[in-house]
């Protein structure tokens, strides 16, 4: 299969791939973008991989379509990153110490395949508002949200896992629908955590999860088995108007 490769290349000036169609497999390896990088409304027809790549200023992937599998491995985003309304039709992997040093926006982003954030650092605020996760979704391997993390109004259709994940800033999980199992395992919420008005349709677990400040589960709906086994609440959680199909496990 034909491919387009940018290896060991440095873009000193702003790069604009907006509205461009990459017709084949696309590789960016050990590539450096010293100024703004624009991939707005771009289409990657095949697999797209970004390995050991650095984006020094702002980066735009808004309204971008990734039709194949996509990898961001050991990538550094030093400036603000915009993935708003992007569509990932294949698997999306953000792995191996990929770092968002500034704010990262995934508002209204659509993940149609399985999604993995493994050993990723979000140093600024991160937004996944109204994002759609159609496949299985996993945040794991010490993925850390240092700023405010917002998932309000997102929809998770497959199995969702937050394993060994740390939220240092406020964590907002309001008005979310988890259609499949939702598992928060050995996850730490160092600041306020809000799950208000969220619908949990599948098996839900917060096992060995630590809530170090206030946590609220106001008006949530748990429609299957719900477990807080071995969870640690440093303050009394707020379950006002919460509804469980059966008593949750503590």
Residue map of PLM features:
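N-terminal leader/targeting and pre-domain segments
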Residues: 1-250
